[in-house]
UniProtKB/Swiss-Prot annotation:
A GO molecular-function descriptor: ATP hydrolysis activity
Catalytic activity: Ni(2+)(out) + ATP + H2O = Ni(2+)(in) + ADP + phosphate + H(+)
Organism of provenance: Escherichia coli O6:K15:H31 (strain 536 / UPEC)
Major location (coarse): membrane
Originating gene: nikD
Gene Ontology cellular component annotations, sorted alphabetically: plasma membrane
Protein name stated in the entry: Nickel import ATP-binding protein NikD
Membrane disposition: Peripheral membrane protein
Places the protein is found: Cell inner membrane
Length: 254
């Protein structure tokens, strides 16, 4: 399995250019946060990595490399990169139970799909009464439960990399805390490389090792999390950090 995945000079376009020459490097055991406002190109960058661009959007330049060798996004999805999506409800077939979803995911990746394995993954993400959960349909579960189920699926995949696209969006504070605890646990136990897409600088401060700031389809600043919080250079980065500090009655040093 690869130890590093690199996005090199990715460019995306629809009727007009959307993403301009984005380069990112994911490394096993480290969390790279991709931050920026809505419409900055974060989710499109993730979609390009996985080969699931929306209709009408095409990649016009760039490549993806695994340990320095060019690779197709289709060869990464699921096997080498697990995904935790922004809207978990859209990721599940409403006609299938959680047992069917989990089992089919495992079988597609050549992983063990016995009930003991599925139960262990569900219990690992804090969903009580795994036997009952496996019988549930998506419409019978809350957003927080579905997000934890997506994390359980990522655990089952045992992929060396994870893309988590706004994993705490639209969740209440308690559910958000649980999801962040689970992501921390995965990093400690499995040490994948993680691309964490978020607009929440509190999430960045808690989980990230490195940060890339995106604005208008471009990476405007990259660095380790401590440097970025203590000495942001770009105006967009300074605005994000200042807004975060203001929540705690603090100001960014000039």
């Amino acid at each position: 399995m690869p130890q590093q995945i690199e996005l090199r000079n990715i460019a995306l376009q629809a009727a007009q250019p959307l993403v301009h020459g984005v380069s990112l490097t994911l490394q096993r055991g480290r969390v790279l946060a991709l931050v920026g406002g809505s419409g900055s190109g974060k989710s499109l960058t993730c979609a390009a990595t996985l080969g699931i661009l929306p209709a009408g959007v095409r990649q016009t330049a760039g490549e993806i490399l695994a340990d320095g060798k060019p690779v197709s996004p289709c060869a990464l999805r699921g096997i080498k990169i697990a995904t935790i999506m922004q809207n978990p409800r859209s990721a599940f077939n409403p006609l299938h139970t959680m047992h069917t979803h989990a089992r089919e995911t495992c079988l597609a990746l050549g992983k063990p799909a016995d009930d003991a394995t599925l139960t262990a993954a569900i219990e690992a993400v804090g969903l009580e009464n795994a036997a009952r959960v496996l019988k549930l349909y998506p419409f019978e579960m809350s957003g927080g439960m579905l997000q934890r189920m997506m994390i359980a699926m990522a655990v089952l995949c045992e992929s060396p990399f994870i893309i988590a696209d706004e994993p705490t969006t639209d969740l209440d504070v308690v559910a958000q805390a649980r999801i962040l605890d689970l992501l921390e646990s995965i990093m400690q136990k499995q040490a994948p490389g993680m691309l964490l897409v978020t607009h929440d600088m509190g999430v960045v401060a808690r989980l990230a090792d490195d940060v890339a700031v995106m604005s208008h389809g471009k990476i405007v600043e990259q660095g380790d999390v401590e440097t970025l919080f203590n000495a942001p250079k770009h105006a967009v980065t300074r605005s994000l950090v200042s807004a975060h500090l203001a929540l705690y009655g603090m100001e960014l040093a000039s």
